[in-house]
């Protein structure tokens, strides 16, 4: 045996080329053996898929198909080869992954070739519902960088993009559609201007949410948004204000104007934005720009049908006419009410802005600061509010440098400290939910579903609902001079309610400043209108308790010759 090996060794030393040729032949033969085993196991997997079960989808659902069993005996090379030969994975939106029941389409569970079904007419058939009260999945669409499918605003986030974040941003701006692309890009628009394609082409995971898909390369996963009433009044970056009669003196009321060919909302809004005006008024083929003033205060709305005249540049838009203007608010900031400062001389009188938590105190402070030009203070200190512009937050509440002091206190001693107070009251059903969201999600955030369905919510209602009533009753009883302001009335008629608050604070009213506030009323202190609870969190017992408390407060208000609680939350 040793002699034979020695002879072979000497032979290959004399002829090394033959040695390397032999080694190469040996490796080739070994590779073919491995490849053959890969083909065999892959064909068995294909047989399983043909019987109505996609092994990849089965794994995703926790199924026990034969695909995994056949792969156990494969070496590394065999497994890699098998993966490369598989039918391309069919990615789909969440509704496809979840719905495999009776209502699922026939192709949802088998090896269906999506590319063979593309057509413009397929759009209606491929529309799948992800209907959670916020949005409905429409499909996968082509997107061209030169000619976008959705032509509104867009934003990118290559770390934290999610489906909800994109939907929320588009909804807040009043767009009807939200589309995601490349896993990280969000596009908004009022109409889809591209054909739909195979669902398999929208196959990229969201950067901030691996469980969802966010389009693909030059492919948009598009959702139709169910807008809140306020969001529905938006048009992209502009806010629809309504239909208004032509002002008596257009030149004074709206100082900039131009005749535009192929008029559209975008063209007029863009022109007024460029000229730095906060209002864009469309009058047929003419575009007017200006600010809200006593000459054109936007308080007397006309029937919107009077403005239903098609734009020459966009058939589905209304551009008004010579007598009735369609008005939009642009993104230009009206600076007439943005200057704020501390009181020039320290006040000896302490004015409270009192409310139950969740009754809109932060929002009311924002409005008061804009309307008066003076900072508001706080009985507490909240660093997050200071960082958002409430500079009076750091002052001691007795400093006398702020126009009023935020407080949620309700004890006799604390109330009698103040010389006068504005008492904010809000529907307890809304206030309790707002405070619960604040407690578990921040000033403009949301509590999670786990908090709502867990022990926290019932315990919260049990402790806080009686406080809602006792807080109001204590301020009515111990307050030296109290002006009641209902959150709902302030929201419904901001101009007159805020005017009354400014007068109560002992300041001169600036109508221009109040009109400016109307255009900036939300500030950064409003929760998104898109995320809604999908169920009523109040039990029958909770409602019975809260209704009794509402009646108690209503009776006390009427005893003092006040209007009582607003109709929307008085028990019926």
Curated annotation (Swiss-Prot):
The chain crosses the membrane at residues 19-39. SUPFAM superfamilies: P-loop containing nucleoside triphosphate hydrolases. Residues 40-572 are extracellular. One of its GO terms (molecular function) is sulfotransferase activity. Glycans are attached at residues 196, 249, 262, 561. PROSITE patterns: WSC. Sialate:O-sulfotransferase which catalyzes 8-O-sulfation at the Sia-glycan level using 3'-phosphoadenosine 5'-phosphosulfate (PAPS) as a donor, forming 8-O-sulfated Sia (Sia8S)-glycans. This is Sialate:O-sulfotransferase 2. The lineage of its organism: Eukaryota, Metazoa, Chordata, Craniata, Vertebrata.
């Amino acid at each position: 045996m040793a002699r034979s090996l020695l002879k072979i060794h000497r032979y290959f030393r004399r002829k090394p080329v033959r040695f390397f040729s032999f080694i190469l032949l040996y490796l080739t033969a070994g590779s073919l053996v491995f490849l053959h085993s890969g083909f065999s196991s892959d064909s068995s997997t294909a047989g399983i898929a043909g019987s109505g079960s996609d092994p990849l989808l089965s794994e995703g659902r926790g199924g026990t198909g034969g695909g995994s069993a056949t792969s156990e005996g494969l070496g590394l090379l065999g497994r890699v080869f098998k993966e490369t030969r598989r039918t391309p994975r069919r990615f789909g939106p969440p509704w496809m992954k979840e719905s495999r029941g009776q209502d699922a389409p026939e192709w949802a569970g088998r090896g269906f070739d999506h590319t063979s079904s593309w057509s413009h007419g397929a759009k209606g058939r491929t529309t799948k519902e992800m209907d959670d009260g916020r949005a409905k999945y429409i499909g996968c669409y082509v997107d061209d960088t030169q000619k976008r499918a959705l032509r509104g605003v867009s934003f990118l986030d290559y770390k934290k993009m999610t489906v909800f974040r994109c939907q929320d941003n588009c909804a807040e701006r009043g767009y009807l559609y939200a589309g995601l692309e490349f896993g990280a890009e969000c596009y908004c628009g009022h109409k889809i201007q591209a054909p739909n394609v195979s669902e398999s082409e929208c196959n990229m995971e969201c950067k901030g949410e691996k469980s969802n898909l966010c389009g693909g390369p030059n492919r948009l996963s598009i959702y139709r948004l169910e807008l809140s009433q306020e969001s529905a009044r938006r048009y992209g970056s502009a806010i629809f204000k309504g239909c208004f009669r032509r002002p008596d003196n257009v030149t004074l009321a709206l100082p900039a104007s131009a005749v535009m060919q192929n008029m559209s909302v975008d063209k007029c809004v863009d022109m007024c934005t460029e000229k730095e005006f906060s209002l864009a008024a469309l009058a047929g083929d003419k575009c007017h720009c200006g600010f809200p003033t006593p000459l054109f205060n936007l308080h007397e709305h006309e029937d919107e049908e009077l403005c239903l005249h098609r734009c020459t540049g966009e058939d589905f838009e209304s551009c008004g006419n010579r007598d009735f203007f369609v008005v939009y608010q642009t993104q230009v900031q009206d600076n007439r009410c943005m200057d704020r400062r501390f009181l020039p001389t320290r006040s000896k009188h302490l004015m409270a802005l009192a409310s139950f938590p969740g009754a809109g105190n932060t929002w009311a402070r924002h409005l008061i600061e804009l309307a008066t030009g003076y900072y508001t203070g706080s009985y507490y200190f909240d660093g997050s509010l200071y960082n958002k512009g409430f500079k009076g937050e750091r002052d001691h509440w007795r400093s006398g440098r702020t126009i009023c002091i935020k407080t949620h206190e309700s004890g006799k001693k604390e109330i009698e400290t103040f010389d006068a107070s504005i008492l904010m009251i809000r529907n307890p059903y809304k206030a309790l939910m707002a405070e619960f969201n604040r407690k578990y999600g921040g000033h403009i955030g949301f509590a999670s579903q786990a908090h709502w369905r867990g022990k926290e919510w019932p315990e919260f209602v049990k402790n806080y609902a009686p406080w809602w009533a006792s807080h109001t009753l204590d301020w009515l009883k111990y307050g030296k001079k109290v002006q009641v302001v209902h959150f709902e009335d302030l929201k419904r008629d901001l101009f007159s309610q805020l005017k009354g608050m400014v007068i109560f604070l002992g300041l001169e009213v600036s109508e221009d400043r109040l009109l400016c506030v109307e255009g900036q009323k939300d500030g950064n202190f409003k929760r998104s209108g898109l995320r809604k609870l999908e169920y009523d969190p109040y039990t029958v017992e909770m409602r019975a308790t809260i209704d009794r408390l509402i009646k108690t407060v209503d009776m006390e208000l009427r005893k003092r010759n006040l209007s009582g609680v607003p109709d929307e939350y008085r028990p019926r």
